[in-house]
Swiss-Prot record:
InterPro entries: Catalase_peroxidase (IPR000763), Haem_peroxidase (IPR002016), Haem_peroxidase_sf (IPR010255), Peroxidases_AS (IPR019794). This is Catalase-peroxidase. Binds 1 heme b (iron(II)-protoporphyrin IX) group per dimer. GO terms for cellular component: cytosol. The gene is katG.
Length: 723
């Protein structure tokens, strides 16, 4: 028999691509299969720090003042490999911080500066983030020096703060507490376009109708942080750009005044770079060759640094003194007429007509040379849009008000995704509490929990009512920006009390009972709601023959309507909740994908999601009391019946509508139960079925209850950063 060699000289003896690229992955073979990867992120396997590492404990060792001094020294320590404009890195560091925080969007709370994700794809290679890799490399000696005591996420934002302070701005404050991730996020949807900077008419565009931007996106193009500086789709028209700005900044959580302040304040210092040919730039960091060592956009064909740098393609500074915080932006904007010109790199920009020589900024390398300042289309929108102009004129006339408004808006921009003040750390945390931080008063902890539980048991509320109300209160939590959750009991306030997903009539009835109990014991309604849910779970476990105590952490407070920005809470309204087998309407996205998104925002793993579904189904918590997925004859008992019957081959499953199925007995043909896609995916998807089979086993009835209680408690305490 002829034997073939295992490999021949010159051939690689490993399997090409299968383990190291996505070309042969399961997703590539079965693109429509439910991808659970978003629930399997940022675990210990990808984290180089040990399980006992605590960033908060490391922060306690940080010499904050020494770090701030080092950062301010860095600003004027120009390096030959990437020289500082006018000898000051402030503009570069501010852009890095701005773009780290500016990817945040309120729609789903994803993006932002809280994780240091600018270090990874796709953000590290976005066109709008060109040359920010240089800023991070300039910071590396400081990160190396302070090590574990400062995260990249904190350092990038603090560098922006110190840049502003070194140029004369009094900042509003700074909070440490952002923790680094160690690989790119898999859960953030950046858009469906397949090319960078695709115009709005391109295939898979994020726009529909007149110019309706797809939710939850905020940026106008794939690869931009906010709007196109040259104009809508690269066509200058400040009034059209103003419309884009309103949508984009609103989706970042900013109003008109904050939008004007951030735009003008961001352009008060630094410059744009476009003095050269963009075609000379090399690949972005993710695509660059090994010898580039993670640096991108390197120019090996011409000088490409200093005055010859190309980044956005726009060329010039906005103000006369680009390394000094002042009111020069508005002075130039209102002092001159502006006309469209092309930069040396071919980008559209606005330049002043007949500007005085002394109003021109000097060259970044030679102070004897002066250049025209520039404005982007977004800058011109601040002058030409009527509402933006009113705000701009006030800032122009009152520089102190502009500085204060910008400082507050900058703090909001850079801290919005950190969540409540309980997560803030450090000596520069502002004493003032701001409404966008969703403040919650501290609640009582010293009370007789067992006495309250006894009162709840005697209240006449059903297991389903108690459990579903607690779930609805807690499910608003978003691990993305740490908003929502049971603390504060905002489920009793507008807008949450009126959300369709919360069944307002039933909710009002339950709250009426629980608020009376809370008042009797002088405790928070928030604690009482969660405690009632725990009581329901304990009673259900007892009905299934298992005695268990659900852990409870007292101390939640009750927020007031004055502490609640009603409009900002609208974005937390659920459009679907697979855990309660409900969705507001049919969507292009399948129900099981919406379930996955909610589970990820709640911080759940796939096994936790699975056990919660199985438990909530048998507890009678379905929205509107529907029977879909209630695969049990003993509703109210915390049994594993959902999994037992889902995996039972005595049944077949027949579709009856877009999102409805009959569970039919094979022998008789009788309909036994009904279900939705969310129910049946736990028997269809191979991974979820593997989990379902674990909980369907005869020897895992107690494990099912224990795991359900653990996952339930995790959700109830998801927003308890104080414990």
């Amino acid at each position: 028999m002829e034997h073939k060699p295992t490999h021949t000289s010159g051939q690689c003896p490993v399997m090409h691509g299968g383990a190291t690229s996505s070309n042969s992955s399961n997703v590539a073979w079965w693109p429509k299969a439910l991808n659970l990867d978003i629930l399997h992120q940022h675990d210990r396997k990808s984290n180089p720090m040990g399980a006992d590492f605590s960033y908060r404990e490391e922060l306690k060792k940080l010499d904050v003042e020494a770090l701030k001094r080092d950062l301010k020294t860095l600003m004027t320590d120009s390096q030959d490999w990437w020289p500082a404009d006018w000898g000051h890195y402030g503009g570069l560091m501010i852009r890095m911080a701005w773009h780290s925080a500016g990817s945040y969007r309120v729609g789903d709370g994803r993006g932002g500066a809280d994780t240091g994700n600018q270090r990874f794809a796709p953000l590290n290679s976005w066109p709008d983030n060109a040359n920010l890799d240089k800023a991070r490399r300039l910071l590396w000696p400081i990160k190396q020096k302070y090590g574990n005591k400062i995260s990249w996420a904190d350092l990038m934002i603090l560098a922006g703060n110190m840049a502003y302070e070194s140029m004369g701005l009094k900042t509003f404050g700074f909070a440490f507490g952002r923790e680094d991730i160690w690989h790119p996020e898999k859960d953030i949807y950046w858009g469906a376009e397949q090319e960078w900077l695709a115009p709005s008419g391109a295939e898979n565009s994020r726009y529909s109708g007149e110019r309706d931007l797809e939710n939850p996106l905020a940026a106008v193009m794939m690869g931009l942080i906010y709007v196109n500086p040259e104009g809508v789709d690269g066509n200058p028209d400040p009034l059209k750009t103003a419309k884009d700005m309103r949508v984009t900044f609103a989706r970042m959580g900013m109003n008109d005044e904050e939008t004007v302040a951030l735009t003008a304040g961001g352009h008060t210092v630094g410059k744009a770079h476009g003095n050269g040919n963009a075609a000379n730039l090399g690949a972005d960091p993710e695509s660059a060759d090994l010898e580039e060592q993670g640096l991108g956009w390197n120019n090996h064909k011409s000088r490409g640094i200093g005055r010859d740098t190309v980044t956005s393609g726009i060329e010039g500074a906005w103000t006369t003194n680009p390394t000094q915080w002042d009111n020069g932006f508005f002075h130039l904007l209102f002092s001159y007429d502006w006309w469209l010109q092309k930069s040396p790199a071919g980008a559209w920009q606005w330049e002043p007509v007949n500007i005085k020589e002394e109003d021109k900024p000097v060259d970044v390398e030679d102070p004897t040379i002066r250049h025209n300042p520039i404005m982007t289309d977004a800058d011109m929108a601040l002058k030409l849009d009527p509402e933006y102009r009113k705000i701009s004129e006030r800032f122009h006339k009152d520089p102190a008000y502009f500085s204060e408004t910008f400082a507050r808006a900058w703090f909001k921009l850079t801290h919005r995704d950190m969540g409540p003040k309980a997560r803030y750390f450090g000596p520069d945390v502002p004493a003032e509490t701001l409404i966008w931080q969703d403040p919650v008063p501290t609640g009582r902890k010293d009370y007789d929990v067992d006495a309250v539980k006894a009162k709840i048991i005697a209240s006449g509320l059903s297991i389903g009512e108690m459990v579903s109300t607690a779930w609805d209160s807690a499910r608003t939590f978003r691990n993305s920006d740490k908003r929502g959750g049971a603390n504060g009991a905002r489920i009793r306030l507008a807008p949450q009390k009126d959300w369709l997903g919360n069944e307002p009539e039933k909710l009002a009835k339950v709250l009426n009972v629980l608020e009376a109990i809370a008042s009797e014991f002088n405790i928070s309604v928030a604690d009482t709601i969660v405690l009632a849910g725990n009581v329901g779970v304990e009673q259900a476990a007892k009905a299934a023959g298992i005695a268990i105590t659900v852990p409870f952490a007292a101390g939640r407070g009750d927020a007031t309507i004055e502490q609640t920005d009603v409009e900002s809470f609208d974005v937390l309204e659920p459009i679907a909740d697979g855990f309660r087998n409900w969705q507001k309407q049919h969507y292009a996205v399948n129900p099981e994908e919406l379930l996955l998104d909610r589970a990820q925002l709640l911080g759940l793993s796939a096994p936790e999601m699975t056990v919660l579904i199985g438990g909530l189904r048998v507890l009678g918590t379905n929205h509107g009391g529907t029977k879909h997925g209630v695969f049990t004859d003993n509703v109210g008992a915390l049994s594993n019946d959902f999994f037992v019957n889902l995996t039972d081959m005595r049944y077949t499953w027949k579709p009856t509508g877009r999102n409805s199925y009959d569970i039919v007995e094979r022998n008789s043909g009788n309909v036994k139960w009904t279900a939705t896609r969310v129910d049946l995916v736990f028997g269809s998807n191979s991974i979820l079925r593997a989990y379902a089979e674990v909980y369907a086993q005869d020897d895992n009835k107690e494990k099912f209850v224990k795991d359900f209680v653990a996952a339930w408690t995790k959700v109830m305490n998801a927003d308890r950063f104080d414990i």
